[in-house]
Amino acid sequence: MILSEYGFVEVGEWKLKESLRSGVTFDLHNFEKERVVYAFVVDDEAKYVGVCDNTTTTLKDRMSRYKGLQGAGTNKRIANKIKGCLERGKSVKIFVLKPESTLQYKGLNVDLVKGLENPLIEKLKPEWNIQG
């Protein structure tokens, strides 16, 4: 799987939970309180790449937005994609990349989490990410 070449590791998975409005919930076993780049993987293929969008958003916070259908329409759309896969008997795994280093450009801190999102989407072409 190409994700491992970039340093992604598996940290959890999505599960069906009919009592929730979204119909899905998640289990995380690592990186819950970290700010990361994440990917949803079905059949060893990255289907979606996203980020914890600001400096205080953790992985658990971000996954909760899909689970609770909070915020942008993207959260509902992706939750429905996850639910559809699970209903067809597929597993939807959660992988993360936590950049270790901090870069600077002329004295400015460079946000590697946000900075890696678009290049990864361009390289991996995950079908759930809206492109172009």
Regions found by a protein language model. Give the residues of each.
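GIY-YIG nuclease catalytic motif and its immediate N-terminal context
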Residues: 1-57
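Conserved short loop/helix modules at catalytic or binding sites
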Residues: 55-106
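Short flexible/disordered coil segments
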Residues: 19-21, 76-80, 108-116
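Solvent-exposed, flexible loop/coil residues
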Residues: 20, 24, 63, 132
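Structure-specific nucleic-acid interaction/processing domains
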Residues: 87-132
